[in-house]
Amino acid sequence: MALTAFTSREGGYSAPPYSSLNLGMHVGDDPSVVARNRALVDEMYGPVAYMNQSHSDVVVEVDHATNVDADAMITRTPVVVLAVQIADCIPLLLEGESSVAAVHVGRRGLLNGITDKTLNLMAEENVVAYLGPSICGRCYEVGADVFEEVVAQFPLAASTTETGALALDLPGALSAHLTLRGVAVVRDPRCTVEDATLFSYRRDGVTGRQAGLISL
């Protein structure tokens, strides 16, 4: 069985507004402090491979701890832990019998098909998907143009905020899509905006990044 974990913002060294277990090197935090935070994660879970994420559909296969330009990683070796960094997007972890993957799924990732691309490259018959904490359908308010673009392709993404504004339920849409593909889904119900123990770009603007982690 694969190792899976989702970090929070607690237990690290970073000062506000990145306090404290910020794992993102690209958010303005002191790189030396982020390195200390990443070392803590290495000590707990093993050597970690990270991605420079850009909402692309790039999937890379890795066999050692590295840093790659991609939005999904696959490995077929147990010697590396895969990390996906988020602060509202969905950290999607995929567990197969002989491979695992970490996928960054935001609105653009949902539309560009990076999840299907990763599943196809894994080429596994039995896959379990773990969806970590992300922004929920009550909090992800969007404009009409964005709403219509996403809902045209994923009708189950349609949602509203508590005030009735248009919103998107990305984890709900992704869960339904995975289920249709025959993938078993395990979903963490926490919302990054609503849970103060998690980083949220939508809530805070300048902030850190937590991670979803998976290894064979």
PLM region descriptions:
Residues 1-216:
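Active-site microenvironment for binding and transforming phosphate-containing groups
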